Amino acid sequence: MYPAHLLVLLAVCVSLLGASDMPPQPLNLVQFSNMIQCANHGRRPTSNYMDYGCYCGKGGSGTPVDALDRCCKIHDDCYGEAEKSQNCAPYWTWYTWKCGSDGPQCDDSETGCKRIVCDCDVEAADCFAGAPYNNANWNIDTKKRCQ
């Protein structure tokens, strides 16, 4: 083996070791992101919803700032109910769905926890698509506005 090949192999191994320390991303967030794009027909990037208002993104508290933020609170509550009543792990639950001309739809074969989580995501994605987006509510100071 050539010395250059050994260096490349070593670099790959070191980078893989570093990546093993990174926490895995919840699988469901990928599906939910795709579902949002289906519902809004690609009009707004999913990243715009990651740090919006008091509830869109990680965590949530206080009173939602507008209709879109209420969609996120409803979604958070839906996941919370799935965790409590069905013992689901919504962020890790993988389900089957399709993107139709009228928006996202859960596969009819899904039941139990998968169906509940899929329904939560469809409801939220449709809600996002129907709610106005206010740029002033993106990346707000949650300590001040979300009491």
From Swiss-Prot:
Residues at the catalytic site: 75, 121
Keywords, ordered alphabetically: Calcium, Disulfide bond, Hemostasis impairing toxin, Hydrolase, Lipid degradation, Lipid metabolism, Metal-binding, Platelet aggregation inhibiting toxin, Secreted, Signal, Toxin
Native source species: Austrelaps superbus
Binding site for Ca(2+): 55, 57, 59, 76
Maturation-removed propeptide residues: 20-27
Record flagged with keyword Metal-binding: yes
Principal subcellular localisation of the protein: secreted
Name assigned to this protein: Acidic phospholipase A2 S3-24
Signal peptide: 1-19
